[in-house]
From Swiss-Prot:
One MF term in the entry's GO annotations: rRNA binding
Short name of any one Pfam family annotated for the protein: Ribosomal_S19
Record's keyword terms, sorted: Ribonucleoprotein, Ribosomal protein, RNA-binding, rRNA-binding
Organism annotation: Delftia acidovorans (strain DSM 14801 / SPH-1)
Cellular component terms per the entry's GO annotation: cytoplasm; small ribosomal subunit
Top-level taxonomic group: Bacteria
Function: Protein S19 forms a complex with S13 that binds strongly to the 16S ribosomal RNA.
Record flagged with keyword Phosphoprotein: no
InterPro entries associated with the record: Ribosomal_uS19, Ribosomal_uS19_bac-type, Ribosomal_uS19_CS, Ribosomal_uS19_SF
The protein's name in its UniProt record: Small ribosomal subunit protein uS19
């Protein structure tokens, strides 16, 4: 179920303030955030946002195709190491 259009997109206020400050000062350092639930807005295009994945902050460069998606979609939380090898096949 998607969010109602009359409510608008959700973005944490502290993230929006940091992004506006970075745009105003033309700062190239990544904006560090733990807010994976925030939606990517058009104001974020061109910024690098460091999204926390539970262990570290993953730098995400925001492009125009990411607008409307959530930040957490671009910082994966699980690493797949592959299926364990079959012990019978080695013999």
């Amino acid at each position: 179920m998607t969010r109602s259009l009359k409510k608008g997109p959700f973005v944490d206020h502290h993230l929006l303030a940091k992004a506006e400050k970075a745009v105003a000062t033309k700062d190239k350092k990544p904006v560090k955030t733990w807010s994976r639930r925030s939606m990517v807005l058009p104001e974020f295009i061109g910024l690098t946002i460091a999204v926390h994945n539970g262990k570290q902050h993953v730098p995400v460069y925001v492009t125009d195709q990411m607008v409307g998606h959530k930040l957490g979609e671009f910082a994966l939380t699980r690493t797949f190491k592959g299926h364990p090898a079959d012990k019978k096949a080695k013999k």
